[in-house]
């Protein structure tokens, strides 16, 4: 391992010990904000510190085995050869692990996310599939103990959604779901199809990270056009009595957000503003990424949200993830929320791409 990497790991080990000592300090314990921040930092350091300690132990084992090679006893030398082989293999494995752990973290990965699902080409069938994707993400959220909240929805005439926006809250939400942005294509026989022909429909998914109030970009109220209207969603007779639904237009960007899920106009406005902030932030993030990565685009986390990323073929029970040429014949499991079968390989490919970029920079 490079000396510069070793020095970086030693610095993290030292910082880990400092944080551990601070967490036992009475003045820190009494300051809840600082205690939470340090607890989070300690948790983030845990894996890399454990990996480096294991690396140091494997290096010590290798050095010890090398000393044993000087022994006169042939049996001891043979044992030393075996121990050297095992220690070298372990060092190689740990070095790969540590390289991944040292990759720069996306600061947004721990944030909550807004998942926007919109029916595209395919009419009623596209809306029905948008509903299927909503259910798939809901099941995945449930498996990860995340919370979901519908921000707004426009139901399809024959089921599903023309559009639905959900907020997903929990640990590491955006870091996993960000890979879902893009075009999702479905191939299946619609229930209304009497000839048994396979139809192709499309749904677009956009995943945006939530912008915490402390980090929120400044939105000038003068740049907003706010309209109220009567909700068309569920809610009984109440929805016909008050203009509780909100439509906010951000004039400089043309971004429009509607929220009508809550009975209170105040709550709908607050939800609409949080979605608007996320969308404006996404535009700003994309501008920044484009400037930084004009010469190299990430294979997996492409900013092109219209790009077709996945195909769900129901007659064959097949899911094809086009970004990494992954094909799985377990469509039912995926639709029931087993998304890790796709997301983990995507994350690994993204890490490999980052490592390759890092090697290019160092080379």
UniProtKB/Swiss-Prot annotation:
It is found in: Cytoplasm. PROSITE patterns: RF_PROK_I. Methylated by PrmC. Methylation increases the termination efficiency of RF1. One of its GO terms (cellular component) is cytoplasm. Peptide chain release factor 1 directs the termination of translation in response to the peptide chain termination codons UAG and UAA. Belongs to the prokaryotic/mitochondrial release factor family. The modification N5-methylglutamine is found at residue 237. It comes from Shewanella baltica (strain OS185). GO terms for molecular function: translation release factor activity, codon specific. Residues 284-296 have a biased composition (Basic and acidic residues). This is Peptide chain release factor 1. It comes from the Bacteria. InterPro entries: PCRF, Pep_chain_release_fac_I, Pep_chain_release_fac_I_sf, Prokaryotic/Mito_RF, RF-1. Residues 284-305 are annotated as: Disordered. Keywords: Cytoplasm, Methylation, Protein biosynthesis. Its main location: cytoplasm.
């Amino acid at each position: 391992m490079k000396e510069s990497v070793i020095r970086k790991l030693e610095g993290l080990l030292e910082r880990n010990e400092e944080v551990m000592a601070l967490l036992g300090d009475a003045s820190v314990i009494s300051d809840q904000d600082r205690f939470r921040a340090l607890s989070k930092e300690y948790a983030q350091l845990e894996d890399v510190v454990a990996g480096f300690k294991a690396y140091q132990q494997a290096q010590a084992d290798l050095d010890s085995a090398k000393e044993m090679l000087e022994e006169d006893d042939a049996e001891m030398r043979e044992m030393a050869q075996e121990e050297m082989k095992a220690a070298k293999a372990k060092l190689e494995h740990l070095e790969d692990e540590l390289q991944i752990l040292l990759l720069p973290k996306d600061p947004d990965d721990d944030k909550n996310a807004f998942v926007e699902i919109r029916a595209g080409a395919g009419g009623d069938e596209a809306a029905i599939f948008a509903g299927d994707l909503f259910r798939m993400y809901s099941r995945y959220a449930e498996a990860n103990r995340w919370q979901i909240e519908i921000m707004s929805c426009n139901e399809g005439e024959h089921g599903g959604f023309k559009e639905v926006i959900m907020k997903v809250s929990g640990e590491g939400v955006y870091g996993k779901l960000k890979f879902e942005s893009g075009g999702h294509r479905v191939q299946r026989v619609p229930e209304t199809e009497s000839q048994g022909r396979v139809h192709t429909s499309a749904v677009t998914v956009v995943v945006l990270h939530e912008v915490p109030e402390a980090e929120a970009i400044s939105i000038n109220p003068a740049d907003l056009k706010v309209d109220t209207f009567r909700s068309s969603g569920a809610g009984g007779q109440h929805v016909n009595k008050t203009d509780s639904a909100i439509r906010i237009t951000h004039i400089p960007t043309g971004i429009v957000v509607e929220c009508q899920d809550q009975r209170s106009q105040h709550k709908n406005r607050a939800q609409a503003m949080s979605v608007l902030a996320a969308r404006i932030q996404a535009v700003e993030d994309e501008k920044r990424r484009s400037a930084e990565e004009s010469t190299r685009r990430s294979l997996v986390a492409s900013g092109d949200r219209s790009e077709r990323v996945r195909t769900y073929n129901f007659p064959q029970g097949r899911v094809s993830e086009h970004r990494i040429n992954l094909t799985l014949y377990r469509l039912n499991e995926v639709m029931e929320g087993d998304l890790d079968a796709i997301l983990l390989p995507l994350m690994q490919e993204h890490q490999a791409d980052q490592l390759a970029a890092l090697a290019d920079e160092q080379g």
